[in-house]
Amino acid sequence: MELVDIWHFLLSAILIEARGDIKAAAEWVEKRIAALDGQEARKAWIFEKEYRLDNMDPIEKLELLIGFSVFRKISIPLFDAILEDCQMSWQDLFRQYIGKNVLNFFRQDFGYKAGSYRKHWHDGREDNVHLVEILAELNDDSDNFKEKLYAAMQVRYEIRGSAQ
């Protein structure tokens, strides 16, 4: 789930760069993801310095991503390499991103802002753990995936004694 949070921050930076133009931001991302097939997909560039991603371990890639962030730079090939290191696809990322978004709405609906929401549910595990389990059970191809996810979370949260 941490990569979802990182992706969220990258998307926010892309939107800021696009001055809030969602279509332009989406086109920027789509263009760069589509370009991931070639030889350049295994490289990241910053200030004319080339980094060969295939020669880096996951920690080095994360450190490079942090360095890019310091200079407000975004490298889709670098993020893609990190996804690969974590054995995640872009589809996995998309699915988890939607899940995290639904979880944030769920938290708000059940009192997060007021302080009554319990992040640790009946079994002492965090809501993120339950989210991962529910995501594994659901088909994300359905038209009402978000609604099914929310409903499944609500059942676990309420029936298992976590709601106040």
Per-region residue spans from a language model:
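Flexible "arm" and connector segments at domain edges
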Residues: 1-164
